[in-house]
Structures are given as C-alpha cells and as structure tokens.
Amino acid sequence: MTNTNRPIRRALVSVFHKEGIEVLAEAFVKAGTEVVSTGSTAKKLAELGVKVTEVSDVTGFPECLDGRVKTLHPYIHAGILADMTNPEHAKQLEEFGIKPFDLVVVNLYPFADTVRSGANEADTIEKIDIGGPSMVRGAAKNHATVAIVTDPADYALVASRVADGTGFSLDERKWLAAKAFAHTAAYDATINEWTAKHWPKPASLDAVEVDKDDQGTEVDSAKFPAQFTRTWDRAHTLRYGENSHQQAALYIDPLNQTGFAHAEQLGGKPMSYNNYVDADAAWRTVWDMAPAIAVAVVKHNNPCGLAIGATAAEAHKKAHACDPMSAYGGVIACNSKVTLEMAESVRPIFTEVIVAPDYEPAALELLQTKKKNLRILKVAEPPKGHEAIRQIDGGLLVQDTDLINAVGDDPDAWKLVAGEAADADTLKDLVFAWRAIRCVKSNAILLAHDQATVGIGMGQVNRVDSCHLAVERANTLADGADRATGAVAASDAFFPFADGAQVLIDAGVKAIVQPGGSIRDEEVIEAAKKAGVTMYLTGTRHFFH
C-alpha cells in the first residue's frame, strides 16, 4: 500500500447514465488522459472532444451476446486489478502487454428503474448488470493504485484531480472504494428483493429440501429467508431526529415509488422525523376503516381521536371531539378527499400535518394560504402490508405487519359469552372499536359511540390503569358529559383479572369486545353477566408496542 497520490494518466469509463459526464470529458481533454470506454459512453465522450479507445480495440474481441459481454476480458480486468506497488504485478502486465488503469468510472444498468417501470421479466433480467459490478468491485479491491468512481456527485472532484494532475491519496481512494462497495451491495440487494418476490421456492422442492432455522423449526423461507437483505436509498436528511440532539434521514425503497414515504408535499414546512412517524401512524389508522370515510387525529404515535362519518367534515368533527386538548399540535389523516367544509373546520386548530389521498381545489387553497406552516401531504394509494422491521442491539426483528385480517377480526367469528346479542347499531360500534384498537399502544382500552372514539386509554403497563384512563378521558373531556355510559369498549388483549372489565362496567359501558384467553376468563365473563353487559370474544389479539 502507498499513501502517495497517484496521478490519473489512464481511465476506464463505462456509464449507463451520461448526466454530468461533460465535466469529466473537459478534464480528460485538458490533461491529455488516455481514455478507454464502451459503446454509447465512448460515443458520447468522442462527441465531447475526448480521444477515446474502444474496449474492443484493447481486447481485440468485439462486443457479443447483445452487449452482455463487453469488458469481461483479462486485458481489461488485469489492468484494473494489478497492484502497481507490487513488482510482480507490474512485471506480469509488462509481459502480457497490458496497461494499468488509474481511474475507473462506472454506473450500472438501472435495475430498480426498470422494475418500477413495470417491465416484464425478460426486460428486467436484461437490466441486471454483470460487467459493471465486476469492474467496480475489482477497482475497489485494488484501491491501492486505482480510484473507483460510481457516484456522479463526485465527477466535479474527479475532474479537478484529473486536470491538476494530483490524483487521489490512499485515504481518498479507500473512501471512494467504500462508496463503490456500498453501491454494488445495494444493487445486489435490490436484485435479491425482486428475485425473492418473483422466484419463490417451487413446490417440487418442498419434499426434497425443508428450510429450518438454527433450532430445527421449519421456516417459510419466502417470508423469512436465511439472509435478510434489503436496501433503501437516502431521500434526504431531516432537520433532526426524535430529539434535537439526534441526527436523522429519510430512506426510500428503490423498487417502490408509492407509499407514504413518497408523499407529495403541497404546502408547509419540511417534514420532521416525528411528523413522519405520527403521519404514517395516522395514515395506517384511517385505512383500517376503509371503505368508510374516516378521519384520525394522532399525536406521539397514538390516536387522540378516530371517527367514521358520512362526510370527511363530519368524520373530522367527531374525531376531534374525542380529545380536543390533545389534538392541539397533532396530525390529521383522512382516507377520503378533503373537502372545503373539512378544511374550514381544520383551519382554527393548530395542526402539524394533514394527509389525504386528495383535496378539493378550494380546500387546498384555503389550507395553503391560511395555514402556511401546515404540512399538507397527498398520498394517492392506501398503505400496503409489508414487513414490520425493528432493530435491536446486534440484530433485527421481522414480522408481518399487523393488519385487520385475522379470523378474529371478522365479527361473524366472534363468540358471544355474556349478555344479549348486540343490536345492529351496537354491533357497528363494536366493530369500529375493535378495528380502532389496533392502532393504540398497548395496554389499550378504547371507548366508542356512534362510530367515534370517546375515550382512549393507551400505553399503560397494566390494563386496569388503561381502563381508568379511557373512562376518565371520556368523562372529563366533554364539558362534564358522561360519555362512558352507553358506550362500547374494546381491549387489545385479554383481561387478566376481572378488575379492568369491572372499571368499564361500573362506568356504564353496554358492551365489550376483547380477545379472551386468560386463565381467569370465567371471572371476567361472570362480571359482565352479573351486570347484564354484552361481551364478545374474538380469539385475536392486537398488541402494539
């Protein structure tokens, strides 16, 4: 290894995207750099006045197989991989008549762009680059004497070092090599993500090979592969993270141009880390209620209110009424077009973010002109059920995203264990409450009436406190009105004792829906029976941590 700068006398350039190449061309011409290139890149450089040698003239072998083989030749790769600080390498190059490269500039076939375009399988496969990654990895490995450039953002830097003859130091070449390895790793991870989805293990191999984890348990390898590889592209950095002393950035899936991360911002200040967290939670929450029109108000990743209405304005009014104090500085999500009437009701409320699939022109104009700091987001499509990924020290936890799709989420599968069967209106409220409870942090208790939340107890370490909190918020946030009486209640998990359910019963709820499954279920059910309260068991839990 050497710490000396190595001037750039000979360069290999092969890029799919030609943007910015003019900067390099000008420097090559000025410095008299010998340039070897391929196909369309060579043509572009020649048009810019660079004296170019085609790769085929170096190898003595033409491009073949529809361009699949261009640079895969010892005359190219030996020139990339020869460590010129090693006398044996230098001697062998001289024996074979091969000249070394000082600089390799490569960007790869646009695989992710091709996938996003909806291309068929054959066209997608053709955009899996082979020669490009080989050159990149070879040059990165041989950073002792070669500078590898994969990022067009570095072209200006490269041009200046070519033009002034200084080249790059070893530390700089290491930095460029690290970027190059990250580039090819992300590229391969993107290909892996696509192939894993489109080329699952065929049924013909199930009897031949059974995937098992390190404990001998059979594994669905399509869902949980032996190596979990994903890549995300940095969209932009954020002002700060969850707190002002934390740095943060937004990354997006290169294969997907939809989803909340790709929201179109129509007004307001830049999104913060907390804005993204709360708005994403609100967005998922309202779509749990589809196809009904729903509005959610979320703060600190918990709903302050959620409601279904005949119109967006009605749904917002009902959702806001649940907890007007907490809604201050919150995030509003609507799964329907925001109308002028809804915008007018939002206007006097301090709100950080509003997100919806669309806005009436008059509604958008009002929000843009009267609430200049309000972040206005438009997301055309509902959320998709991808994996839920959480990083822990030294690893990742991966699970299915919790959706309202379990057997116990269907009210037809519920088991009536106490009281009379709910009438149509009560059942509607129970179904609403059960769907709403999924988005509340555990331990979660939710009271609802007229398909709107009226009291929410969230995030308590015991269920009794969550029950007390839900009742308290129902009865102290409504100008003295008793909203718990006659409401229905939902619990995200079973009642371990009868005491939590008794709090709800004493508050006057008329029906409760909960998973069941406690060893003391009979005590809980008996408390409901004694009070004449309807109780359904779902058999499904919706913890949310």
From Swiss-Prot:
GO biological process annotation, one example: 'de novo' IMP biosynthetic process
GO cellular component, one term: cytosol
SMART domains documented for this protein: AICARFT_IMPCHas, MGS
PROSITE patterns listed in its UniProt record: MGS (PS51855)
Highest taxon listed in the record's lineage: Bacteria
Pathway assignment: Purine metabolism; IMP biosynthesis via de novo pathway; 5-formamido-1-(5-phospho-D-ribosyl)imidazole-4-carboxamide from 5-amino-1-(5-phospho-D-ribosyl)imidazole-4-carboxamide (10-formyl THF route): step 1/1; Purine metabolism; IMP biosynthesis via de novo pathway; IMP from 5-formamido-1-(5-phospho-D-ribosyl)imidazole-4-carboxamide: step 1/1
Pfam family, one: MGS
Residue stretches spanning the membrane: none
Reactions performed catalytically: (6R)-10-formyltetrahydrofolate + 5-amino-1-(5-phospho-beta-D-ribosyl)imidazole-4-carboxamide = 5-formamido-1-(5-phospho-D-ribosyl)imidazole-4-carboxamide + (6S)-5,6,7,8-tetrahydrofolate; IMP + H2O = 5-formamido-1-(5-phospho-D-ribosyl)imidazole-4-carboxamide
E.C. numbers: 2.1.2.3, 3.5.4.10
Domain MGS-like: from-to ranges: 1-150
Disulphides: none
Keywords: Hydrolase, Multifunctional enzyme, Purine biosynthesis, Transferase
NCBIfam families, per database record: PRK00881.1, purH
Family: Belongs to the PurH family.
Domain notes: The IMP cyclohydrolase activity resides in the N-terminal region.
Name of the protein in question: Bifunctional purine biosynthesis protein PurH
Organism: Bifidobacterium longum (strain DJO10A)
